[in-house]
Amino acid sequence: MLIELNGIKKYYNSKKNRIIALDGVDLKIAKGELLAIMGKSGCGKSTLLHILGGLTGINDGAYRYRGEKVDFENKRKLAEFRRKNVGFIVQDFALIGEKTVYGNVELPLNTRKLSRNKREEMVYEILNRVGLEDKVRRYPYELSGGEQQRVAIARALIHNPQLLLADEPTGSLDEENQRIILNMLKEVVKNGTTVVLATHDIDIAGECDRYRYISSGKIKEPEKI
């Protein structure tokens, strides 16, 4: 099992009260699985993805990755965990407007000691996989929404992560581009990467290997939706 969550709790304290984002979440995710996390806005989907990616800590429970407990208190190990294992995609693409497609995709390689030729080889290889090798010198504003999301996917995959987290990756796209992105994620899974995507769309969730529903910070079985 790639991931095991046991009794995960996450809350935020405001001046007036405590906001519970996740309330005792148990979840297992297998290697090479395409899993959808469904739910309405504010239900805890994004928080769950951030925990899986080591971007935010937990208040209680345990997160095990490949059988080893993720230590949220050790910032150095946590950063290493993210760098080695995790790719992240968000709905609004989060591309840097001043950088070309090449520059955006190359960003995750800045922490690695690679020759210019090797970096170029890796960037062109991943852009070829997402069908954007002819857009390499374009800027984000020159691309369609679907193309921008493909750039974001390429950037997330450039360091070959074992875990790809996608937060509403098709939410702002038309039906044709939704299909393109979903098929792309399925190909990623075929290559051995585990993909967890957050969505509010039952049709998107139905295309995944399985899905789980979050309501009021708790995981519900599909038959209980």
Segments from the language model and where they lie:
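Helix-to-loop junction immediately C-terminal to a conserved catalytic motif
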Residues: 53
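Short coil-to-helix segment of the ABC ATPase nucleotide-binding domain corresponding to the Q-loop/switch region
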Residues: 99-107
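The feature captures the beta-strand-to-loop junction immediately N-terminal to the Walker
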Residues: 38-40
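A short, proline-enriched helix->beta-strand linker immediately N-terminal to the Walker B motif
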Residues: 158-162
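Catalytic Walker B motif of ABC-type/P-loop ATPase nucleotide-binding domains
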Residues: 164-167
